[in-house]
Amino acid sequence: MAKRGKRYQQLLSLIEKGKLYSPKEAVSLVKKLATAKFDETINLAVRLGVDPRHADQQVRGTVVLPYGTGKEKKVLVFAEGEKAQEAREAGADYVGGEDLVKQIESGWLDFDVAIATPDIMGTLKIPSRLGKILGPRGLMPNPKTGTVTNDIAKAVKEYKAGRVEFRTDRYGIVHVPIGKASFSEEALYKNLMTVLGTLLRLKPAAAKGQYFKSIYISPSMGPSVPIDTKNIADLIKQEEAA
């Protein structure tokens, strides 16, 4: 493994070896670790006690971060007629049908989220025509993540406001951006606890033993801060009841 630079080593020294931090302590510390010359993204990585090789243990969903991600998302909508108008009024960046499919087939991918109405998925044969292009990039509209829907306006507004998708990778880890280093501690904390609360609600019935195996937050260019998982479920419930 390549040796980390001096700056990284200095930041690493701020993390107490062997300590597991409370969520609020971790948020406070991670802001101090974000010393790059740009507004670093704060990333959350949660290793869950699931076996993603089994379909009934995969964790996938979306969450609307109360303080957003700090990044404006470009939203594309496959829709026609009244639904297309709803999408435009809700703030979608690109709205269309066959024209957009052809653009994507020719290599254009200047968007972050693709949403579609259920009927247009079939009439334009989107899964068969665009599956190999959008699928590997995580851009394929999907009913499970709310991106195949008749409530186009709601979906567009939520993604513009800070809705993010997540799913377990093959190691059972979920990666979610929870904001920028410039966010207040309160904003990062609320975003963090919102994601953890969503993950807890999505716990598969087949998952056995400890659910939250490990939780880390880190800036784009800095080391990870470990969060104590011991009483995290109780803390999530306290936050939601507050």
Swiss-Prot record:
Keyword Transmembrane: no
CDD domains tied to this protein: Ribosomal_L1
NCBIfam families: rplA_bact (TIGR01169)
Database matches in HAMAP family: Ribosomal_uL1_B
Family: Belongs to the universal ribosomal protein uL1 family.
Binding partners and assembly: Part of the 50S ribosomal subunit.
Protein name per the record: Large ribosomal subunit protein uL1
Lineage: Bacteria, Pseudomonadati, Dictyoglomota, Dictyoglomia, Dictyoglomales
